[in-house]
Regions:
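Sequence context surrounding c-type heme c attachment/ligation sites in exported
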Residues: 1-166
């Protein structure tokens, strides 16, 4: 049983604002850049679509996420992939949370923008009295985990849409 309410425009902007425009959160090429089973065999999805002229082209040099639920993958890659798909749309230079300086999209490489020992700038009481966004190896000292597990509407992240299936 799922209860859904239609959000108002301001609530839509919470997630769908990018560069001051409301935009859909849709598939990114990097999330589609993987093997997929088609009727005629298993192929890279983007290459398959390009060969069938469904798309014109795609960037060949893609940083693609790993399956964050796959325990055989590198833990850093798993965490980065999870944060990219669940947080990176808002937490990017063009996203609604750009003023935080916490950029969780997969292309980000600067430790400070990834939250490592980054002091909060816009969390208010969301910091829970903690000092840094992410303290490597110490999740209980990290604001990021505090906000992800909180049920307090003024603290929790994401602010709405807590579970996503990808």
């Amino acid at each position: 049983d799922v209860r859904y309410r239609v959000p108002n425009v301001n609530q839509c902007k919470e997630c769908h604002a990018a560069e001051d425009k409301i935009t859909p959160i849709g598939p990114k090429a990097r999330n589609l850049n993987k093997e997929f089973e088609f009727n005629d065999g298993e192929f890279n999805q983007l290459t398959y679509w390009m060969n069938r002229q469904i798309i014109d082209d795609y960037p060949m040099e893609l940083v693609s996420p790993v399956d964050w639920t796959d325990e055989s993958q590198n833990i850093n890659d798993r965490v980065r992939s999870y944060l990219d798909v669940n947080c990176g749309h808002c937490h990017s230079p063009t996203g609604n949370a750009n003023s935080t300086g916490l950029y969780l999209h997969l292309d980000e490489t600067r430790d400070i923008h990834l939250g490592l020992y980054k002091k909060p700038v816009a969390t208010g009481r969301g910091s829970g009295g903690l000092k840094y966004s992410i303290v490597p190896g110490k999740p209980d000292e990290s604001i990021l985990l505090h906000r992800m597990i909180s049920l307090d509407p003024g603290v929790m992240m994401p602010e709405s849409g807590r579970a996503l299936s990808h």
